[in-house]
A protein has these predicted regions:
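Low-complexity, acidic/polar, glycine-enriched regions of mature
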Residues: 21-200
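Bacterial Sec-dependent N-terminal signal peptides
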Residues: 1-26
């Protein structure tokens, strides 16, 4: 009988030890932290090309956050203010206003109807980031390489993201849809060059 009691005692003791070990965080384990994007310090530059040249400019982040676990970024969400589009290469004020008016209305991004675009990170593998980009009311998964640095609770990230506008229903001037457009064609793909700064 004493032997049975001893065995039961050992089993119960072992059970409590295992439960305690399971509930105790592993030494060195990292907790995920959310870093707020500094929208003033962060920059997004865009570049769009056509047969006869190209245009470039900036667009602002409205808000954003990065999720970091130790030295690695594991998630994040960002909101882009589509009404903040600026063209920096057209110096003539009247032509610049006309150009911005064109790309923000019906033929292109319809910013009154779609005032923001969003990007949500869904996967991070090595240097590659995958996420859901919502633009012009359409959501598509995109993958791109990024360089991320974590120093003293602050994160910086740079990336160049090619975006095919026709995937998001923006078809104006695309040879894919208008075969006879000739030298008035506008490239389907434009680039977003991103520099992010985020901290606690």
């Amino acid at each position: 009988m004493k032997a049975i009691k001893s065995i039961l005692f050992l089993l119960v003791a072992a059970l409590f030890v295992n439960v305690a070990m399971a509930e105790t965080p592993k030494k060195g384990a990292k907790k995920a932290v959310t870093l707020a994007v500094d929208t003033k310090a962060s920059k997004i530059n865009w570049l769009a090309k056509k047969v006869t040249g190209q245009h470039e400019g900036t667009i602002n982040l409205a808000s954003g956050s990065l999720v970091a676990n130790g030295m690695k970024v594991t998630g994040g969400e960002f909101v882009i203010d589509m009404k903040s589009i600026v063209c920096t290469d057209i110096t003539d004020a009247e032509y610049n206003k006309k150009f911005i008016g064109h790309i923000t209305t019906g033929d292109f991004f319809e910013v009154e109807k779609y005032p923001t675009s969003t990007f949500k990170i869904t996967k991070v593998e090595g240097a590659n980031i995958t996420g859901d980009l919502t633009l012009h009311g359409v959501t598509k998964s995109v993958t791109f390489p990024a360089k991320v640095s974590m120093v003293g609770g602050k994160a910086t990230a740079t990336a160049s993201i090619p975006v095919d506008r026709t995937d998001f229903g923006v078809k104006y001037g695309s040879k894919k849809f208008f075969d006879s457009i000739g030298d008035k064609a506008i490239d389907d793909v434009f680039n977003l060059n991103i520099n992010l700064v985020a901290g606690k």
